[in-house]
From Swiss-Prot:
InterPro entries: NA-bd_OB-fold, POT1, Telomer_end-bd_POT1/Cdc13. GO terms for molecular function: RNA binding; single-stranded telomeric DNA binding. Transmembrane segments: none annotated. Its main location: nucleus. Expressed at low levels in roots, rosette leaves, cauline leaves, stems and flowers. GO terms for cellular component: chromosome, telomeric region; nucleus. The keyword Transcription regulation does not apply. Signal peptide: none annotated. Belongs to the telombin family. Keywords: Chromosome, DNA-binding, Nucleus, RNA-binding, Telomere. This is Protection of telomeres protein 1b. It is found in: Nucleus; Chromosome, Telomere. Pfam families: OB_POT1A, POT1.
């Protein structure tokens, strides 16, 4: 009798679940959207679809005694089996409620690239049946040709983001870094350049990156060398538990990210409504740098010229007009310690700012600049004869020096007055200070560059 009752057990199609308000049902579906757990009440949400309902998905809310008991989805596109979940209305939306404190249970299985019928996570009350394996197999086969379409979501490129607003982002995970025990950073990229920021800081030295320290060269070599890499700050417990399913190289859709600017650098944070959404394999393939920008080679300078198309002002001139433009990320990740480069950058800050302090005790110009493009920031020095060439005016003519610096920096450094430094061309060479530790002591210096007369 027990066997007969179990054989009659069936999953409800998701399209029929929308008509089963207040009933307890059994469901199986593909996870197409993942929300973050609410640390205060131990709950989280996701959306599922099946072959008979592939719209935006059925919301499923999980409630547990502890965060540890909530589903820990390894990848968007995995399969979930739900037993005795109740169809309810939450915020006027039909939702399947899986409450651990009642008779509900769930099990998580790997998605279309697996043949395993053993769940990688299941709740204590879950009981696997032999016929469930057929449902798993059929869903995985269906996913091979499945195309998820959620017409309610519009995605914004990084080039179009706005400070203080929330947007949806379709991007590639470049790197995931744990900086402190309480903070992680997601590094994401979509092949476009984030808008340059106005500079508001007057006296405080600007950082080179959002994270506390720049990543080492061997890690940066895994980054794309064109387009901007956005840092997403992750510091809430619930957020950190959700991002464990992300891996470098994955293409992911993030809904409702909050974008902000600090010290002239873009970053983003999760909001209570941030979710991760399913991405098709063909969409992931489109995020290949080689497909987006072909490599060009220069026999004379560095064989790394990319599709650098940033136009520059005529404020500066260089002695090497035939050299290809490269990005600052190209420079940071170049395979030789010493080399020469030509780039288009913004001078966002210089030290010392007071022209009366530009010279050292020997009378040589000595200046450190923070240079920026869409890919990175670096420190670059200007020294001695190259400094004389750069400014091209008498050392006693302080007014001319101030005027040239202001043109380069996009205005005077005044409290609460934003500057918008212009894009200028610049030649750099890299060198090392310590022969026994060349990469760690690698530095950059400006050369064969000058500020044109206004």
């Amino acid at each position: 009798m027990e066997e007969e009752r179990r054989d009659d057990y069936k999953f409800l199609r998701i399209q029929d679940a929308f008509k089963a308000l207040h009933l307890h049902v059994n469901l199986i579906g593909v996870i197409v959207e993942l929300g973050f757990s609410n640390g205060s009440d131990c709950s989280c949400t996701l959306k599922i679809v099946d072959p008979w309902y592939s719209g935006s998905g059925l919301p499923v809310k999980f409630v547990a005694r502890t965060i540890r008991d909530l589903p820990r989805v390894e990848s968007i596109g995995d399969i979930i089996l739900l037993s005795r979940v109740k169809i309810v209305l939450i915020n006027r939306k039909i939702t399947a409620l899986c409450n651990e404190t009642t008779s509900s249970s769930f099990a998580l299985f790997n998605g279309k690239h697996s043949v395993d019928s053993i769940p990688y996570q299941s709740s204590p009350k879950f009981l696997m049946r032999e016929q469930d394996k057929n449902f798993l197999s059929n869903l995985r086969e269906w996913m091979i040709t499945y195309k998820f379409e959620d017409g309610s979501c519009c995605f914004t490129s990084l080039k179009d983001i706005k400070e203080g607003e929330c947007s949806n982002l379709s991007c590639q995970i470049v790197h995931i870094s744990k900086v402190y025990k309480d903070r992680w950073y997601l590094f994401v990229w979509d092949g476009t350049e984030m808008p340059p920021c106005n500079i508001l800081v007057k006296s405080e030295r600007l950082p080179l990156c959002v994270e506390p320290e720049m990543l080492p060269t061997y890690m940066l070599r895994k980054f794309p060398t064109f387009g901007s890499v956005l840092r997403i700050i992750v510091d809430r417990v619930s957020e950190k538990q959700a991002i464990h399913c992300l891996q470098p190289g994955q293409h992911v859709k993030l809904l409702n990210l909050f974008f902000q600017v600090n010290m002239g650098l873009w970053n983003a944070t999760f909001t209570p409504s941030t979710k991760m959404q399913y991405t098709m394999s063909r969409e992931m393939e489109a995020f290949s740098p080689q497909r987006m920008c072909g490599e060009k080679f220069s026999p004379r300078w560095n064989p790394i010229a990319r599709c650098i198309s940033r136009s520059h002002s005529e404020i500066t001139g260089v002695a090497h007009d035939d050299a290809p433009f490269v990005s600052l990320m190209d420079i940071l990740t170049y395979h030789n310690v010493t080399a020469k480069f030509r780039c288009v950058v913004r001078f966002i800050q210089v030290y010392p700012r007071d022209v009366r302090k530009l010279r050292d005790i020997n009378g040589n110009i000595k200046l450190v600049a923070i240079l920026e493009d869409a890919t990175a920031r670096i420190h670059a020095s200007l020294y001695a004869d190259e400094g004389e060439k750069f400014f091209g005016c008498d050392e006693s003519d302080e007014e001319a020096l101030v005027k040239k610096l202001n043109r380069l920096l996009g205005g005077e450094e005044m409290e609460k007055v934003p500057r918008n430094p212009p894009w200028v061309q610049c030649c750099l060479f890299s060198f090392y200070k310590h022969k026994m530790d060349q990469w760690e002591s690698r530095r950059f210096r400006i050369f064969d560059t000058w500020i044109n007369a206004s």
